[in-house]
Protein backbone atom coordinates (compact mmCIF):
# COMPACT_ATOMS: atom_id res chain seq x y z
CA UNK A 1 0.00 0.00 0.00
CA UNK A 2 1.41 3.35 -0.92
CA UNK A 3 0.53 6.54 0.95
CA UNK A 4 0.56 9.92 -0.75
CA UNK A 5 1.49 13.12 1.02
CA UNK A 6 1.33 16.74 0.00
CA UNK A 7 4.46 17.51 2.00
CA UNK A 8 7.18 15.45 3.63
CA UNK A 9 8.95 17.34 6.40
CA UNK A 10 12.48 16.26 7.28
CA UNK A 11 12.82 16.46 11.06
CA UNK A 12 10.40 16.09 13.95
CA UNK A 13 11.91 18.47 16.46
CA UNK A 14 10.44 21.81 17.39
CA UNK A 15 10.89 23.31 13.90
CA UNK A 16 9.89 20.23 11.89
CA UNK A 17 6.87 19.56 14.09
CA UNK A 18 5.78 23.19 13.82
CA UNK A 19 6.10 23.14 10.03
CA UNK A 20 4.11 19.89 9.81
CA UNK A 21 1.46 21.23 12.18
CA UNK A 22 1.02 24.51 10.30
CA UNK A 23 0.81 22.75 6.92
CA UNK A 24 -1.78 20.28 8.26
CA UNK A 25 -3.88 23.18 9.61
CA UNK A 26 -3.97 24.49 6.05
CA UNK A 27 -5.30 21.17 4.79
CA UNK A 28 -2.09 19.53 3.58
CA UNK A 29 -1.50 15.85 4.29
CA UNK A 30 1.94 15.79 5.88
CA UNK A 31 4.51 13.26 7.01
CA UNK A 32 7.37 14.11 9.35
CA UNK A 33 10.45 11.91 8.98
CA UNK A 34 13.19 11.91 11.58
CA UNK A 35 16.30 9.78 12.01
CA UNK A 36 15.53 9.33 15.71
CA UNK A 37 12.91 7.09 17.29
CA UNK A 38 10.48 9.78 18.44
CA UNK A 39 9.59 13.42 17.92
CA UNK A 40 11.70 15.87 19.89
CA UNK A 41 14.51 13.41 20.68
CA UNK A 42 17.28 15.39 18.96
CA UNK A 43 18.51 18.84 19.89
CA UNK A 44 14.96 19.85 20.85
CA UNK A 45 14.92 17.20 23.57
CA UNK A 46 18.25 18.47 24.86
CA UNK A 47 17.13 22.09 25.05
CA UNK A 48 16.53 23.84 28.35
CA UNK A 49 13.12 25.05 27.10
CA UNK A 50 13.98 28.74 27.22
CA UNK A 51 11.70 31.10 25.33
CA UNK A 52 13.65 34.22 24.42
CA UNK A 53 12.96 37.08 22.06
CA UNK A 54 16.48 38.51 21.79
CA UNK A 55 18.64 37.59 18.83
CA UNK A 56 21.29 39.45 16.87
CA UNK A 57 19.58 38.85 13.51
CA UNK A 58 16.37 40.56 12.46
CA UNK A 59 14.85 37.29 11.19
CA UNK A 60 15.70 35.42 14.38
CA UNK A 61 14.30 38.17 16.56
CA UNK A 62 11.12 38.50 14.45
CA UNK A 63 10.45 34.76 14.48
CA UNK A 64 11.04 34.54 18.23
CA UNK A 65 8.83 37.52 19.05
CA UNK A 66 6.01 36.21 16.86
CA UNK A 67 6.31 32.81 18.55
CA UNK A 68 6.09 34.45 21.97
CA UNK A 69 2.51 35.50 21.18
CA UNK A 70 1.56 31.89 20.42
CA UNK A 71 3.08 30.68 23.68
CA UNK A 72 0.91 33.20 25.56
CA UNK A 73 -2.19 31.17 24.62
CA UNK A 74 -0.74 27.78 23.76
CA UNK A 75 -3.98 25.79 24.20
CA UNK A 76 -5.87 28.03 21.77
CA UNK A 77 -3.05 27.85 19.24
CA UNK A 78 -3.19 24.05 19.35
CA UNK A 79 -7.00 24.09 19.23
CA UNK A 80 -7.38 22.45 22.65
CA UNK A 81 -9.49 23.12 25.71
CA UNK A 82 -7.85 25.07 28.53
CA UNK A 83 -8.09 22.16 30.98
CA UNK A 84 -5.95 19.79 28.89
CA UNK A 85 -2.57 19.22 30.58
CA UNK A 86 0.00 21.00 28.43
CA UNK A 87 3.44 22.44 28.71
CA UNK A 88 2.96 25.95 30.09
CA UNK A 89 4.88 29.12 29.29
CA UNK A 90 6.23 30.71 32.48
CA UNK A 91 6.83 34.35 31.59
CA UNK A 92 9.46 35.44 34.10
CA UNK A 93 11.65 37.57 31.85
CA UNK A 94 15.35 37.29 31.13
CA UNK A 95 18.28 39.47 32.17
CA UNK A 96 21.48 39.56 30.12
CA UNK A 97 24.61 41.36 31.23
CA UNK A 98 26.10 43.91 28.85
CA UNK A 99 29.76 43.01 28.34
CA UNK A 100 32.57 43.74 25.94
CA UNK A 101 32.26 40.17 24.65
CA UNK A 102 28.62 40.68 23.57
CA UNK A 103 29.31 44.22 22.34
CA UNK A 104 27.12 45.51 25.17
CA UNK A 105 24.15 43.97 23.30
CA UNK A 106 24.11 46.85 20.81
CA UNK A 107 23.05 44.69 17.85
CA UNK A 108 20.48 42.78 19.91
CA UNK A 109 18.96 46.04 21.17
CA UNK A 110 18.86 47.48 17.65
CA UNK A 111 16.94 44.44 16.39
CA UNK A 112 14.57 44.50 19.37
CA UNK A 113 13.95 48.20 18.80
CA UNK A 114 13.20 47.69 15.11
CA UNK A 115 10.51 45.15 16.02
CA UNK A 116 9.16 46.91 19.14
CA UNK A 117 10.23 44.00 21.34
CA UNK A 118 9.95 45.33 24.91
CA UNK A 119 13.13 45.63 26.96
CA UNK A 120 14.58 47.69 29.79
CA UNK A 121 18.21 48.72 30.11
CA UNK A 122 19.36 48.45 33.72
CA UNK A 123 22.38 50.20 35.18
CA UNK A 124 24.43 48.24 37.76
CA UNK A 125 22.41 49.59 40.68
CA UNK A 126 19.14 48.58 39.02
CA UNK A 127 20.49 45.06 38.37
CA UNK A 128 21.12 44.57 42.08
CA UNK A 129 17.87 46.28 43.14
CA UNK A 130 15.67 44.23 40.79
CA UNK A 131 17.52 40.94 41.18
CA UNK A 132 19.09 40.86 44.66
CA UNK A 133 20.70 37.45 44.08
CA UNK A 134 22.72 38.92 41.20
CA UNK A 135 25.82 41.06 41.32
CA UNK A 136 26.85 43.78 38.94
CA UNK A 137 30.51 43.08 39.70
CA UNK A 138 32.70 42.39 36.70
CA UNK A 139 34.86 39.26 36.72
CA UNK A 140 37.75 38.62 34.41
CA UNK A 141 39.79 37.74 32.62
CA UNK A 142 38.60 34.13 32.44
CA UNK A 143 40.30 31.90 35.00
CA UNK A 144 40.11 28.20 35.81
CA UNK A 145 38.20 27.32 39.00
CA UNK A 146 41.39 26.12 40.69
CA UNK A 147 43.08 29.51 40.14
CA UNK A 148 43.41 31.33 43.51
CA UNK A 149 42.17 34.52 41.79
CA UNK A 150 39.13 32.77 40.29
CA UNK A 151 36.49 34.80 42.15
CA UNK A 152 38.25 38.17 42.11
CA UNK A 153 36.36 41.04 40.57
CA UNK A 154 37.70 43.79 38.35
CA UNK A 155 37.99 46.68 40.76
CA UNK A 156 35.97 49.74 39.86
CA UNK A 157 34.07 48.08 37.00
CA UNK A 158 30.43 47.06 37.20
CA UNK A 159 28.07 45.71 34.59
CA UNK A 160 24.70 46.91 33.44
CA UNK A 161 22.18 44.56 31.90
CA UNK A 162 19.15 44.35 29.65
CA UNK A 163 15.89 42.82 30.85
CA UNK A 164 13.49 41.28 28.33
CA UNK A 165 10.10 40.87 30.10
CA UNK A 166 8.63 38.66 27.35
CA UNK A 167 11.12 35.84 27.90
CA UNK A 168 10.68 32.79 30.08
CA UNK A 169 10.66 29.03 29.94
CA UNK A 170 8.37 26.10 29.21
CA UNK A 171 7.54 23.81 32.11
CA UNK A 172 7.08 20.06 31.83
CA UNK A 173 3.42 19.04 31.93
What are these regions (language model features)?
Residues 153-173:
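Helical element adjacent to the flavin cofactor pocket in flavoenzyme catalytic cores
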Residues 11, 34, 98:
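Short beta-strand/turn micro-motifs composed of small residues
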Residues 2-3, 26, 121-124:
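C-terminal lid/capping helical subdomain adjacent to the catalytic/cofactor pocket in oxidative enzymes
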Residues 24-44:
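Glycine-rich FAD pyrophosphate-binding loop
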Amino acid sequence: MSERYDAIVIGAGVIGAAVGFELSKKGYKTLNVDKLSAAGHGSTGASCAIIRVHYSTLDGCALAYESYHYWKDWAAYLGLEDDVPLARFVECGCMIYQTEQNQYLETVLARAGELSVPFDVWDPEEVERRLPIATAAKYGPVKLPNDPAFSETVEGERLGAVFFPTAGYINDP
